[in-house]
Amino acid sequence: MRLFVALFPPEDVRDELRRHLRDAMTRPVRLTAVERWHITMAFLGENPDEELPEISQAVGAAAAGGGPIRLRLAGGGNFGTALWAGVDGDLPAFFRLRARLPLGNGPFTPHLTVSYRDHAEVRAALNAYAGPPWTASELVLVHSRHAEGLGYDRVSAWPLQPDPCDGRVAQA
């Protein structure tokens, strides 16, 4: 089972970015499916089904003291031909949450992939983008059915709850 842990921006945030990109295009460009737009927190790779309870427990424990986190999509970049929107906001809290997760704690650029094909207009639109702020309030464990056509299934989701020992008050 191919797994990753992600934050999913709310529908209105994804729609705003999609509109911004579509408005910038003079010709159609293939974007990734908007309903699957997410910010990967940790890629867990292939895991035997019998390890799912242990993985779920670890992700749930991370969520229990990891948020909520105020974020926004802003700016952009690319990894090869893949184009992405950047993530801005409370990045210290974002990285604290990421550090609580199993695996995936090497070098990392928070991002949301919008296309796997480089396109100058989309790249320019991403660089100029500053989306609305939103609160990440849920951490999701996702099964990627990569071999069966790039579908995603939500395995489990946990509310991001503040760490009671942290002393910070989450902003809504």
Model feature map: region roles:
Residues 1-172:
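Histidine-dependent nucleotide/RNA phosphoesterase domain, centered on the 2H-phosphoesterase fold
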